[in-house]
Amino acid sequence: QTEARLRSDMQMIFQDPMACLNPRQKVADIIAQGLDIHHRYHSQKERTEMVADILHKVGLAPEHANRYPHQFSGGQRQRVGIARALVMNPKLIIADECISALDMSIQAQVVNLMKDIQDETGLAYLFIAHDLSMVKYISDRIGVLHLGYLLETGTTEEIFSHPVHPYTRSLISAIPNPNPVVERSRIALHYDYKTSGLDYGAGTMHQIEGTHFVRGTDADLEKWV
């Protein structure tokens, strides 16, 4: 029972919407799969209404329920993936590179949709991405991982206003600035673990301030802080 409850409370949005949607199933059946497994409805009418409601919430029409994945654009397919996760009314959604396969304009639409839903329902996201500009926009807290190690963690404000680890600093310095004057003077920092002289395995987490922690040795921290 505990495992079943956890499965319904935690849902996933995948990177490639086309690869994770069954091409032989209609959208209604794709979205309702979790409802079917966990017996969340009492009649077919209720099932249909739940699918229609969640489609409306993600900006799709009820008639889209009878279409197949190949009949949608990339952004629409990702909305179907979001609907499939949301229909279970989860407490946590793990979004694994869920916007990386989309065009920039569609990325903004999907992230705005996710934020609106979060504001409305209070659910939590574990948002996995390499685009730090989007991470900054959607996240309250950030964890920076490299080669399987958590290198730096803190609030969004702590990470972006005072990045400490060289890898974090290189990632943030690579973010383009929309201001052309600032962009011309932006210096992207280069980071290569092989030549950095760092040993992630030898480091431990050090508190910088508040909830801001950085992995490194005592000698590393003396150089960085």
Which residues make up each language-model segment?
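Conserved ABC ATPase "signature" region
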Residues: 45-63, 172
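A short, proline-enriched helix->beta-strand linker immediately N-terminal to the Walker B motif
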Residues: 87-91
